[in-house]
């Protein structure tokens, strides 16, 4: 393909500022199977036509800059530029529109979520011609998906490792999150696992503080795991948070966890960064460790409706970077989410092929070509009375993570864990018998209470 007309040698270089839409707005463009497609919610400054703003987003997130430069003539912009190929209004929002942008695959390094985000969202969000900008969704082409390892193991391999089938997995975040000594922390882990939980969890900000250094915590938690396994006959785990200040230190902690023989480690993937996360994910696959992912800091990025990035994009990025679990919201509890929207990105985490469905916030059909799935984790503000709804909404392939809903039991940690396990098994049994969890959930839990703490 030839460069732009303005930069052909026969015409000569012409300096100056020109409208973005002359080069980057191409409504006639037919997207390719290899293009990365993006849907941006754009709120422009007053008086700026949508075509110009959509083209500006495409330009500033690909090959463009604020003026014409002579080096444009040394490459083919038609081959490498991003293109705004469609614009549609946002219902009920007169000042907003959705700009669809296609990016050629050659703009991105293979297997690098870091590079993908640096290109697409790294600079354009500070563009002063826009009042606000939000990345709503991405379509990752099959050709790019195949350059990623994805989750270290995936849903089926995890179930096989744990020998647990036919129900959601149960977890608990140890509280108080900060201040416990390593020995007392390990005691709480043991009580919860002995009571019937599958996992316990470090909170996201438990790393290696003066009151509890990481090595001590790992040792006491491993002791709790082995002791509870011996008593219950079930495989247990604790999400040992390997997040650290450097990648080298993070891997050192993961290596120690592997040497202890525990099944799973944890990473804060947004604060730790995608490069660190992908590094840890590769280590976990090579060494048989499951990887639990916490999304600490996500609300800084995804909470605003008009600016930032929707969590479904972060969820897709995590599936590419690698993680076997990720916190996904609850739909119920203290951090309630929109049910259809939440289930939309839950499906993007678990399923192999997801059709476009705007009612669930899915802007593009996504084919993961057998990339392993990720278990969504429902957590924060949930308790046993939410169990029927959680079982119905999330299904078997999920982790139900209780903190205060376990440790807040008036009889202590172990009875709290027993109550969680009894409630879950009662709901699963009732569902399998054909009972309606939505209408009979309260009755099912009350029946289970007769034989449970």
UniProtKB/Swiss-Prot annotation:
Return the EC number.
4.1.1.39
Keywords annotated in UniProt: Acetylation, Calvin cycle, Carbon dioxide fixation, Chloroplast, Disulfide bond, Lyase, Magnesium, Metal-binding, Methylation, Monooxygenase, Oxidoreductase, Photorespiration, Photosynthesis, Plastid
From the Swiss-Prot or TrEMBL record, state where the protein is found: Plastid, Chloroplast
Q: State its cofactor.
A: Mg(2+)
According to its UniProt record, which residues of this chain constitute the active site? 175, 294
Q: Name one GO biological process term.
A: photorespiration
Q: Gene Ontology terms, cellular component aspect?
A: chloroplast
Residues annotated as site: Transition state stabilizer: 334
Q: How is the cofactor bound, as the UniProt entry phrases it?
A: Binds 1 Mg(2+) ion per subunit.
Binding of substrate occurs at: 123, 173, 177, 295, 327, 379
- Modification type N6,N6,N6-trimethyllysine: residues: 14
Tell me the GO molecular function terms: magnesium ion binding; monooxygenase activity; ribulose-bisphosphate carboxylase activity
Q: Which CDD domains match?
A: RuBisCO_large_I
Propeptide ranges, please?
1-2
Q: Where is the signal peptide?
A: none
Positions of modified residues (N-acetylproline): 3
Which family is it part of? Belongs to the RuBisCO large chain family. Type I subfamily.
Q: What else is known?
A: The basic functional RuBisCO is composed of a large chain homodimer in a 'head-to-tail' conformation. In form I RuBisCO this homodimer is arranged in a barrel-like tetramer with the small subunits forming a tetrameric 'cap' on each end of the 'barrel'.
What does the subunit comment say? Heterohexadecamer of 8 large chains and 8 small chains; disulfide-linked. The disulfide link is formed within the large subunit homodimers.
Describe the function of this protein.
RuBisCO catalyzes two reactions: the carboxylation of D-ribulose 1,5-bisphosphate, the primary event in carbon dioxide fixation, as well as the oxidative fragmentation of the pentose substrate in the photorespiration process. Both reactions occur simultaneously and in competition at the same active site.
Q: What is this protein called?
A: Ribulose bisphosphate carboxylase large chain
